[in-house]
Amino acid sequence: MRLIMMKVSAYDLNKIAEKLNLSIKDLNKAFSRKILREDEYKEIKTLLFKKEFKGIEKGTVIFLNDNLDVVRGYPKTYRAITLYPTIKKHFIDKVVIEEKLNGYNIRIVKIDGEVYALTRSGYICPFTTKKVKKFLNLEILDDYSEYMLCGEMIGINNPYTPYYYKEVDRGFENLGFYIFDIKERETNKSLPIKERINLCEKYNLPYVKPLAVVDKDEAHIHVREIIEKLNKEGREGVVLKDPDMAVSPIKYTTHYTQCEDLKSAFTFFFDLGMDFLFSRVVREGFMSYEFKETLEERKNRAKDLGEAILLPMVETINKVASGERVSEDFELIFDSEEDFDEFLDFMRKMKMVITIKNIEKIDTEEGVKIKAVIGKIYNKTNDKIISYLNGTLWE
């Protein structure tokens, strides 16, 4: 069989296959299907799994260095649609309840003496890499280079999932990182929760603190109470974990989050609407059933859902009708114009259609910063609205 060597011909594909516990045949199949692709960051060459393949997680990265260092992709966290009996069936004994933060998933690693922050998809994000170096004491990766720090970057000033958190407000910037998992980066094995917490406290690293530790037989009662409290506070939800991480975590989100997701999706409804709609409405239906809502409570839930869908949709149509090209806007803070330009290059590399809406220098207690508003354009939504407003028929 002819091997697909590409630009990685300088590297031993047999060793790469061995590292991943794959056959050469499977490795070439991943190349030919464009599941395994090349990437580069500041002349650091990597291979990246764009999809799950033969047990290798999406977002898994192989650094093409002498060691062929592997960073496994973060596994998908499955969702509980019902609290009971799902939690009782899934867990062994005790259940650790942690808050689910509304941000973007990042893995922090140290390879050949350099720190990198990888997105869920496996790209080295220059914006996030610079921020975690600034925010965190990363000496832990000097002592435990085999680990990856898995966590959530949260705050309104982030380029992927902007949402305000008062606990990460720094005056001129609302951004921060919380660790929710520490894994062996080549095996994806998680540390037990107590061990992870001890390490975070030893190195003074911010981490997601457990809200409760409960017996699995009664966990559904406690989770519901916590979910109702988080819903009132406008928070996202919970992640449920085994204390030893012996079984995979599961998640459960609030009514508030479902509605906020729909609002975001139906602002750009021709691009995102269908992908978001069905799953969230199903979650709401099962939540209404399990929480034994009265007819009045159910009608209120339905009203919330309807408003989350219709109001942003009509607002978008109005904006486009008045000549505006709608975009999802992010306000970001950079240390320099060079950092700003580097991030723009990264976004274009990700095939994002962007527009710079504003850029200015601001004085902070840390010196002069660059504040930029970047708009992500959803062409399909803009173009289809214009088309239908001009009389095109729905096919």
From Swiss-Prot:
Transmembrane segments: none annotated. Signal peptide: none annotated. This is Uncharacterized protein MJ0414.
